[in-house]
Amino acid sequence: MTEVGAADLSRLLQSKRNECSSIVTSRKRKLRELFVVATQSEGLPHPVLTNPDAPTTTPAEWQFLQANDINQSKTLNEASIPTRPTFSLEVLKKSLAKSIFIANESVPKQTSENSNKSHVTDAQDEQQSNRASLSTKSDAAATSTRPNTPETSTESATTANPVPPPAKNTQAVLPPADAIEKPIPTTSPDVPASTGANANSITNEEDRSDPNEVASVPRQPQVTFETGTKGEHVETGTSSVKSGHGVGDSAVTTGVPSTVKPSADVTRSADALSSPGSTAQSATTPAVHDDASTDTSPEHEGPQYVEPAEQKKIEDGTHERDTDKYHQSHQDGDIRAPSTKDLEDRVLEAPPDSAEAQLLQESIRSNVAAENEAALNSESTSQEADTAISAPVSEDVNMSDVDDRVVKAAPTVGEKVEEKRAQQILDTDAKSALATGAPAEISGSKEIPDSQEEAPEQMDVDAPEPKASTESQIGAPISLEKLDAADTGPSSPTPAHIAEVATPPEPVRQNSPPKAERAVTRVSSGAMRPKSVSEIVGVTPRQTPTLEHISTNKSTNHQLTPLTSTPKSPTLRHRHISAHQRQASRSQPSTVVFGKQSKKGEEKSMVTSQHDTILPTEDYYTPLFVQGFAGSSSWMQPIEKILYTANKTVTTPDANLAIQDHQACKVLRRVYHLQQHDKWSLRQPKRCPEPTRPPSHWDVVLQEMKWMRTDFREERKWKRAVAKNLAYACAEWHEATPEERKTLQVQAVVPPKMKPASDVAMVDAEGTNHLTPDLVSSEDVESIDNLDDLIEDFPETIAPSAIFNLQDEDVVFGLRRTAAADQLLEELPMFGAPLQVPKFDLTGPEWDPDAHWRRPALPLSKYVEGHMKLVSDGPPRKRSRYNYQNEDSDDEGEAGFVSSDSTPSLPLPSATDEVALFNPEMKHIRDRLYVGHQFRPPSEYPMPSQSFFECRSPSQWTIAEDDELRSLVREHSYNWSLISSILAPRSIFNSGAERRTPWECFERWINLEGLPADMSKTQYFKAYMGRINTAQNMINIQNQAMAQQQVNQANGAVTPGRRRHQSIPFRVERRRNQKHLTMLDAMRKLAKKRETTAQKQQHTASQNAANKKTNESASQRPTKTPGEYSRLRYERDQALAEKMAQFASRQEAQRRAVLQARAQGQAAQMAAGTPAAVQAGQNSAQAAAAAAAAAAAANGMNGVGRVNVPNQLAAAAAAATGQARPRMPMQSPAPASMGGVPAHMASGLVPPNQMNSVQQAQMQAMQAMQGQHNRMPMPNPPPDVSLMMRAQRISEQQRAAQMHAQGGPGTPGQGAVGAQQSPPAQMRNAMNGVNGINSNPMNQQSFLNNAQAMMAQFNQGNLSSPQANGLHMPSGPAGSIAPRPQTQLPAAIQAQLNQLEAQYRAKNSSLTSEQARQMATEHLTRLMMAQRSAMNAAAGTAGGQGGLAGSIAATTSPHQYAALLRQQQQQQASAAAGSPGQQHQQPHQAQHQPQQQQSQQQQAQAKQQQPQQQVQAHAHAQAQHQAQQQQQQQRQASGSATPSAG
């Protein structure tokens, strides 16, 4: 992202200009070639193709170039390409006949005409195999006038380097055709023979080019004939010429250039198909060359022969045409050898000046010479045939055509005559070359290899290589210059007969090093074209070349031809798959085929582009277009709808796909609109220059933070190094022997402990102290004395800035303070610039704090060569051990926008290796920790039960799965859990056939391998096998029973059941995967169930709608206004007030009657004797009841609203203290508590109605209080009339009894009193019976009878019938269901409950408030029960019978218990006073007696209890003190919270 320098910019611009000019030139040449190909069918004009800037020949061509001129920003318009003329059938027949029936030329002219024949080099063919498909050899004429200085200098340079580089390999030029005298028999049709391409002229161009560049210019397409015109390359037993360095062995025999080309070996068989692209056709004639070498495989490349480079410059178009005719003369047919008569007829038919006539004439002469030498060559033919068959075949052979064999045909001309003639010619030319000195330009005698041609549009044609050339040039003198060039081309193995006959006059052996194999062939690189005419006519499949472009700097280094190798050890060469496909697929006949233009871009730039070709389908606007089309079309749905209607599972990436696509389309739409409005340019302007921002304090802080980060990192490295060294030192000490430890110890003396000196005069101490050292400047902190101390105490402590040049594990050494050390430290580099305080100068700041991110914009947009891709990190994943970054690295990615590649270039090793037990090097540790090779079952899982084996479905195993199970058991050593996890299918839903549990794998392995003999006898495996066998027997029994049932019920309509299979695993050939079918079936059933449910609901709704009356209006409750509700409330309150007033008046009358009765009783008691005690007790009870009634009446009349005061407790308090206002603010308990009130309190109890005078008026207030506290009680129900009437009846009975007692004697009076009080006793017993205390069936029945009578009496007033209070049923108006009000606890007990609840919560914080309250209540209840039992024990009543204990047993709340306790105190006081208190316990005993015997037993009980009451009084006096304390606390707590009634 930084700016480019001026020098680099100029070089870059120059390279871009050169590239642009080369692109324009190349495009123009290609356009002209295209026009020529489209308009001409046979000959192609060479000057036009070699010089793209040449003037156009026709106006049509000029118009075509103008219509497609790239300088005018025009692209290729295919409509402007002219239509190619049709190729007539006659021309096709003539071309095929001419190419098939041409014979080899045996005696070519040895004049300058023959010597001027151009033999094209295969090196140039390899180098320029990718050039323009229509370039020809006529450019040699244009370059013949080129000065020969470069060639001469190149050759001289080559002479100085006799040993060529091993990586260059080209082919030598063929010798003249006059040495070729023998026709060649047919060979394998699909294996082109190695021809002159293996013997073409080579020049020393490897020193002038980069070996890494590849020639990439389209080459001339060619048409080759069926091979077989060239002798088979066979291994020689006597010659040491290898295919890798055979060139050197044959080419260094002499330094004289060869001017005579030896004849070909006519007895060779076809070579293996290697690189057919080397068979290039000449551009001046439509003739087809079958002898062009396609053999570049290492096994079939023979020696190379080089001619001087000056010969190339004297060639002209005629010479090239002669050369092509010469090539055609070697194409004697693989099908048949034409006769001289046929050739003469064709000569007469052909035009006299045409190339065809000349070629036919030469073919006639070749046939004549061949017939003369046929007899002499018959013997050598059979011998070479055997050798040819045994010759190795190249890897490039198309092995698909196995029926094509190497077949030897008619015998050829004697090769000895040919060899002698060729040797003479070689010697003659060599002497003439030596006479002229350095290689010079010899007219008509030498050739210039095409590899030296520098024209970028050069196109070469392979020349045939007669086999005799190898044997002739073995003895021919060849210059060292040719040696270098020859060594760069592929060579063919020397035939056996050549090695035997050749006798070099000056044998010079050169041991060249073996050449390295190259993995790229001309076929694989597309440099050659594997298509021949024989394949066109249907003999072999054709091969299509891949064309490439060549850069301006071309040389032999561009060749992709592999070096040769020894035939005995052929090396594999990589070929493209596409080449094989083209070979196998294209076998249709055709004529001249021109190569297709490669899609690969021109590689002419200085830097090779690494970007892939952008296909039209990879346009980054494609998602936008697809989205637009999906939105407008009806058959194409967007991704959102597709995902919404998906039938399968949609994963998170699938769901994110729609979001990402929407985001991408949003960005692309914006970019598209900007481009449409010319606001999105590929060239971006540079950033506008802005004034430099003055540095701020924050910039300094950031700099310091970065410096501290670096400092801390370096210090961490240093500390790690120190720790590492210390750890190694400790380990070394630990492992060392005592002797070694002595050597490791530091020779140091422990200083003696200093004894605390006593007080010494300072005068004496001055003489013994050392002198104070001189002060050292603050900079010199490391003096010599301090240095020793530092080394001893802290040997590895030093600043991190001094360890720049050391390794991470090294520690800084001590450095003595010297001038050299100071200079060294000053010259050490620093990690960062020292911090500087910024100068806040707005005119010219010293540095730009924004320089690290504010950089000049790139001249090109990133979208020019890149694609717009939205990359998401995906879902968060657990961090792997391999996913870490080097924390000590300084690469912070501060410019993260520059490089978007956050992935490390190299894979990081694991951060820790503690979990590397499965590595191979950890196997010994693994074996020591766990014996894995020992046989064991999956004991980490429980053994399956027998029912599992009976009910399971058998698992299915294929042969592959069985083999995998065996291998996993061997590999993982009976680790059944791991084996199961590997074999288990990767799916959540696994059927029984796919079950791969550890026990299932173990069972299958036992079925395959069997249990070991010693293991099968153990009890463990006996039980295991027993379960399996028993389960199978049970399945068999079930199947038999089912079959028997079917037989017995054969005549019935019983559906036969499915026979069960064995549940053991079994093998199948292929397991049917019914997983998806099962899932679909389940989905279908679920959908059907839902549809059925919906239909039923719809049907039910429709029926309900039909059954409903249409005109039936919904009954609406009359709505009342708030005023109406207020009036109703007022009326009800008034009615209640009137009732309460009436009730109060009655109670007042009763009170007065009680007082009057008491007074009368006291007077009667004084008159009578014994009955006075009983009457006194009754009078006291009546007085208490009257006082309670008076208090209740006062509360009701005053309307203070003490609605929560229990009536029973108020009565008890009134009876005990005689006061009219109780101080217990407690809510009245449930009516059931009345059942537990003893007989002596029954007369004083008043119904709760007297306390509820203003309950309805305070309903809203009570509800508000309930909302404030969840434990506030509900308002009391309406007054219970039954209790009121019951209390009234009791009062009346007591009054009547009192009056009766006053009127009669004592004993009858007492009996009357007992008789009058019996109904309340019965009622009390019945109520207690309902409560489960002292129950009696007779009493219950009597109570129910009385209750029914009372219900019948009070139902007339539309009041609810009184219920048994023991049933805990609330009473109220008829039809109302009111909840039972909760008991409101006093403040003292509430505080105690809260304290207990807090303690429970502190012990267990998980308790809820309800649980804590319940536990506290239970604990407090237990405490109160314990206190009550203590009271009973103190009172002397066993089992809670009689007295206060009986009454306590019937109580249901602590409030009643407190009230009873106060009444007990009153009783104790009266008992202590005299006999009236002693008679107070009579009602307790009377409640357990039947009604008939109660009056008779009362007198006896009174006499018997008189001594007991005295003992009990003493016990009560002891318990009284304890009860008074609790009572006092309750009174204080309740009195503070209880409002007064007055």
Swiss-Prot record:
Residues 108-118, 126-146, 185-203, 251-261, 275-285, 550-559, 580-591, 1094-1119 have a biased composition (Polar residues). GO terms for biological process: chromatin organization; DNA repair. Residues 288-302, 309-348 have a biased composition (Basic and acidic residues). It is found in: Nucleus. Residues 685-759 form the HSA domain. Residues 108-531, 550-611, 871-906, 1088-1127, 1220-1244, 1292-1324, 1462-1542 are annotated as: Disordered. Keywords: Activator, Chromatin regulator, DNA damage, DNA repair, Nucleus, Transcription, Transcription regulation. PROSITE patterns: HSA, MYB_LIKE. One of its GO terms (cellular component) is nucleus. Residues 955-1009 form the Myb-like domain. Residues 1303-1312 have a biased composition (Gly residues). Residues 450-463 have a biased composition (Acidic residues). Residues 147-161, 366-380, 560-570, 1463-1542 have a biased composition (Low complexity). Its main location: nucleus. GO terms for molecular function: chromatin binding. The keyword Nucleus applies. Component of the NuA4 histone acetyltransferase complex which is involved in transcriptional activation of selected genes principally by acetylation of nucleosomal histone H4 and H2A. The NuA4 complex is also involved in DNA repair. Component of the NuA4 histone acetyltransferase complex. Belongs to the EAF1 family. This is Chromatin modification-related protein EAF1. It comes from Gibberella zeae (strain ATCC MYA-4620 / CBS 123657 / FGSC 9075 / NRRL 31084 / PH-1). The gene is EAF1.
